[in-house]
Every structure is written in C-alpha cells, then in structure tokens.
C-alpha cells in the first residue's frame, strides 16, 4: 500500500488515479488527520507527499514525515510541495522562483531514481511559485529545467525522491513511468498499462 499525504490539493487525486492504474493499493489521508508516527507504522510500503497551496511549514505533517521516513529508511516521493518539504527537511532553502502555473518546461535528468529508463529531455508541467534552492549535500540533483531550476533530486543513501513538476499532469510526458519507477523502488509490482 502507498500512503498518500493530501496537502488539500486537487492534484492529489490525479496522482492517486495514476498509482491505482499502475496496480497500487492507495490510502489517502489529509496532512492534519494522522501523525508521522502513525503514518510510518501504518504498514505502507511507500509514501507520497502531495502538492499543495502552501509552504512546507504550513503543510501539516509533511516535514515531520520526511524525517520519520528518513529515520526508518522508508521510500518517499514528494511532488511539488512534497519535493519542497524534502529539500527543506534536509537543509535546503525554499524560495520564491517565479509563478509557473500550468507552464511546461523541458526537463533533463541523469536517469537515476524515478527517472530510470526515461528519455532526456522530456516535457514537465510546472505549477509552483516556490523552488528548492541551495540543495544540501544529502540530496543529489538528478533533474533540472531548461531555465536552470532544480526539478528533481534523490537522497544519496535513502529511498527518498522529489520532483518539483507534476508527473500527473496530462501535459507532462512519462508521468506513469515515473510513478511506476517509484512503485519499483517501494518493492511493489507494477501493472502494465494497455
């Protein structure tokens, strides 16, 4: 089961739908309806922190869950606000980066983590005004946009991954493949799409 932390964002349900299409059992809880301790002892094989309209400091258990997953060595994927929460937890700065609502960018990656087996570059859809800047040493930047911003990173040693853009957007290429890679990181089977 994948436990999805919903940061009160409609994009959460698109992510859930994609995960379910790939064969995952998914449980969704709001960011203020569970503690990080309850989350990591829920039996979930992996965790996804959703996008949301606020900052990591205002995102319920999101920051605390990053730490709990890190302590337990559990797989975690952060999308947009979730990505920012991972970056901030490990010592990065979350700063204003210009309004990018529904804009596409070419994103280039190194083929690691959730980007394994994907062509580079591809189109990613961005819905954000904040970005992670000054990425800490614990995280490896593995994806950048054509305008030079960090679009993805992975932890050097832990199964923790973040993407700034939205894999669940219809305008993002290879969204299902990125989420399938995350399910594999979680040790879960992946259903082939027709």
Feature roles, as predicted:
Residues 5, 121, 162-173:
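Phosphate-binding/catalytic loops
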Residues 41-116, 123, 179-180:
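Cysteine-nucleophile active-site neighborhood
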């Amino acid at each position: 089961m994948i436990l999805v932390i919903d940061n009160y964002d409609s994009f959460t349900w698109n992510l859930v739908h994609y995960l379910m299409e790939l064969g995952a059992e998914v449980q969704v809880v709001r960011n203020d309806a569970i503690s990080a301790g309850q989350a990591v002892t829920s039996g979930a094989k992996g965790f996804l922190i959703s996008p949301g309209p606020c900052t990591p400091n205002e995102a319920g258990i999101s920051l605390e869950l990053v730490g709990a997953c890190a302590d337990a060595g559990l797989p975690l994927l952060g999308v947009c606000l979730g990505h920012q929460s991972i970056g901030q937890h490990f010592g990065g700065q979350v700063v204003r980066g210009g309004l990018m609502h529904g804009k596409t960018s070419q994103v280039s990656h190194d083929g690691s983590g959730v980007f394994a087996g994907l062509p580079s570059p591809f189109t990613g859809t961005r819905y954000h005004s904040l970005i992670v800047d000054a990425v800490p040493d614990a995280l490896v930047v593995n994806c950048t946009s054509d305008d030079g911003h960090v679009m993805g990173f992975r932890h050097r040693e832990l199964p923790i991954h973040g993407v700034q853009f939205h894999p669940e957007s219809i305008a993002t290429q290879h969204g299902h493949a990125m989420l399938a890679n995350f399910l594999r990181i979680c040790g879960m089977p992946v259903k082939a799409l027709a």
